[in-house]
Swiss-Prot record:
Keyword rRNA-binding: yes
Pfam families documented for this protein: Ribosomal_S14
Subunit structure, as described in the record: Part of the 30S ribosomal subunit. Contacts proteins S3 and S10.
Protein name according to UniProt: Small ribosomal subunit protein uS14
Species name: Methylobacillus flagellatus (strain ATCC 51484 / DSM 6875 / VKM B-1610 / KT)
Function field: Binds 16S rRNA, required for the assembly of 30S particles and may also be responsible for determining the conformation of the 16S rRNA at the A site.
Alphabetically ordered keywords of this record: Ribonucleoprotein, Ribosomal protein, RNA-binding, rRNA-binding
Family from the record: Belongs to the universal ribosomal protein uS14 family.
Transmembrane segments: none
């Protein structure tokens, strides 16, 4: 089980990303717009750099919803491989069966 503070830190990052998503998209659109003037693009780049670091979605880490484990997480389920295996063996994940051929 991961430390509670790490799980809470990731939750705080997710909240920050949601909060600034629209503003980041707007600034990135200006920066990537070929028709925008150089001054507008520079101003947008400055504003983007002034946003909090944790507002960037790249800084998020996928964590297991049950244990908080940062590695081995299946993004389709949001659960770490070890917990996913336990749930599958108990039949608690619908539509997943053990492979046999």
């Amino acid at each position: 089980m991961a430390k509670i503070c790490m799980i809470e830190r990731e939750q705080k990052r997710r909240d920050t990303v949601k909060k600034y998503a629209a503003k980041r998209a707007e600034l990135l659109a200006v920066i990537n717009d070929a028709n925008a003037s150089a001054e507008d693009r520079r101003a947008a780049r400055q504003k983007l750099q002034s946003l909090p670091r944790n507002s960037s979605p790249v800084r998020q880490r996928n964590r297991c919803a049950l244990t908080g484990r940062p590695r081995g997480v299946f993004s389709k389920f949001g659960i770490a491989r070890s917990k996913l295996r336990e749930l599958m063996m108990r039949g608690e994940v619908p539509g997943v069966t053990k492979a046999s051929w």
